[in-house]
């Protein structure tokens, strides 16, 4: 018992550790001979090669089952969201206020529209084609260059008086501002059976002492042509541009906060979702001072 309980000195422990690292009598290093180290290394190399191969095969099979032309993440909403340009947000949503006689208050709004419509210049639309059918543009095959599908052109000049060319101020200087309404994209979404979706803007609460909101729409009737639908995704249609509708508000009361709602009227577009205020419509507060 005394021998078992005898404590080893530091030099003895160092000597044992050195013999464990390299034992000249047996030719072992760290408890194994060189040949055993070679065999165990080959075993682990083969093991991890096989495991990596199985993992790569699983990833390959998984990727083969995924359609590259279908987005990985899609919203559960059946109707597209609607956005507004210019978009100035306040504490409770879109809030736009400016003074007709002070250009510094609306110059930024006009600049926002110019910058947004730069993507709708003829040069930016060179990869798209002219469409005039006014019917759904179904494409089963990839006939466009680079195994893609064709996209229909939409240029800023289609917005006519709200394109920024005849009036670079977009009507802000005269108190008849232009606002651009855009529907978000949904892959393979069809807004209706045969009728083009239409934008309708009105006061949310009609002022008692004034007429209904008068709006001039561009393109005519405020419609999104059907040949821009369906959308097949960014990979299939890399040159696709959302169609736009511009609403020129003609009789907004001065020096008063008004709330305007622009709805998309179409058979397959709903705008009464209490949980999403931008589904199928967009609301914004507007105040024009003079």
UniProtKB/Swiss-Prot annotation:
Gene Ontology CC terms: apical plasma membrane; potassium:proton exchanging ATPase complex; sodium:potassium-exchanging ATPase complex
Region feature (immunoglobulin-like): 194-290
Modifications after synthesis and translation: N-glycosylation is necessary for assembly and functional expression of the pump at the plasma membrane.
Protein's cellular compartments: Apical cell membrane; Cell membrane
Tissue expression summary: Stomach.
Coiled coil: none
Disulfide bonds, paired cysteine numbers: 131-152, 162-178, 201-262
Keywords: Cell adhesion, Cell membrane, Disulfide bond, Glycoprotein, Hydrogen ion transport, Ion transport, Membrane, Potassium, Potassium transport, Signal-anchor, Transmembrane, Transmembrane helix, Transport
Disease: Parietal cell autoantigen associated with autoimmune gastritis.
Purpose of the protein: The beta subunit of the gastric H(+)/K(+) ATPase pump which transports H(+) ions in exchange for K(+) ions across the apical membrane of parietal cells. Plays a structural and regulatory role in the assembly and membrane targeting of a functionally active pump. Within a transport cycle, the transfer of a H(+) ion across the membrane is coupled to ATP hydrolysis and is associated with a transient phosphorylation of the alpha subunit that shifts the pump conformation from inward-facing (E1) to outward-facing state (E2).
Subunit-level organization: The ATPase pump is composed of two subunits: alpha (catalytic) and beta (regulatory). Interacts with alpha subunit ATP12A; this interaction is required for the formation of a functionally active pump and targeting at the plasma membrane. Interacts (via N-terminus) with alpha subunit ATP4A (via the P-domain).
Name of protein: Potassium-transporting ATPase subunit beta
Source organism of the structure: Sus scrofa
Gene: ATP4B
